[in-house]
A protein has these predicted regions:
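Conserved N-terminal Rossmann-fold NAD(P) cofactor-binding segment
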Residues: 2-17, 40, 46-94, 102-109, ...
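Gly/Ala-rich phosphate-binding loop of Rossmann-like dinucleotide-binding domains
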Residues: 31, 35-36
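Short glycine-/small-residue-rich Rossmann-like dinucleotide-binding loops
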Residues: 100-102, 137, 192
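Rossmann-like NAD(P)(H) cofactor-binding subdomain of soluble oxidoreductases
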Residues: 104-171
Length: 237
């Protein structure tokens, strides 16, 4: 993904290879959305039972209307598969989406261990010129101050030189994911202007919703958290 023209060509030819790390409640529908758009997509998860079941053709999210039909189609078309082998999946991918849990602990402090663990793994296996998009909900500044530091930790990766990164926070409620993925606006922010444009171009192909361009990753994550707070307050009343 050296430039926008290359990305545009890879989208038109459907040659862009996608890896979604974390295929749970949000990650699996995300992966299916990219596969439905005609892009070769592989989902990675540490849950071996889940991966095996998916590869046998069993859709696990029975309470998500509309997705079982999509699942069956992309499986039949050969556009989606799952694996526990992150090394193999990343080595074949151009776009890596991180859809990992960031739960709150008993002190209401977010647990980013899943994201941090995966980023440590990526330092040795990420392909040159790959794009990482963090869909998980994270606090403003965590990507810039923590995740990039981890990715660059072995001195093999250098953001803006041999990989790039951005965010497009997921925006969906359990049980209504297909509706939300096709109706609710998404925030987009990249580490630089070109990355933001590339992410926007990709997501515009996959999701038929308004993409709201943010000036940077930190702002996108801040707006996402503000939206979550607003929603929770409304639910509370």
């Amino acid at each position: 993904m050296a430039n926008i023209d290359e990305v545009r060509n890879s989208l038109e030819s459907k040659s862009l290879k996608v890896c979604v790390v974390g295929i749970g409640r949000i990650g699996l529908p995300t992966a299916l959305s990219f596969a439905k758009a005609g892009l070769q997509t592989i989902g990675v998860d540490i849950n071996e039972k889940l991966v095996n079941s998916i590869n046998l053709g069993n859709f696990p999210l029975k309470d998500e209307p509309g997705y079982e039909e999509i699942f069956n189609k992309v499986k039949k078309d050969g556009n989606f598969s799952a694996t526990t082998n992150i090394n193999e999946a990343i080595s074949k991918s151009d776009l890596i989406l991180l859809s990992l849990p960031t739960p709150m602990d008993k002190k209401n402090i977010p647990n980013y261990s899943a994201l941090e663990t995966v980023c440590k793994q990526l330092t040795d296996i990420l392909q040159p010129n790959s794009l990482i998009v963090v869909e998980s909900t994270i606090e403003p500044g965590f990507l810039e101050n923590n995740l990039i530091s981890i990715l660059e930790g072995t001195d093999k990766l250098h953001v803006g030189k041999n990989f790039t990164i951005g965010v497009c926070p997921e925006n969906a409620n359990p049980g209504e994911i297909l509706h939300d993925f096709t109706n609710l606006p998404r925030l987009v922010g990249g580490i630089d202007e070109q990355t933001t444009k590339i992410i926007t171009m990709i997501y515009d192909l996959v999701f038929s919703v308004e993409l709201v361009i943010m000036p940077d990753c930190k702002t996108a994550n801040a707006v996402k958290l503000t939206t979550n707070v607003f929603r929770d307050v409304n639910i509370g009343f």
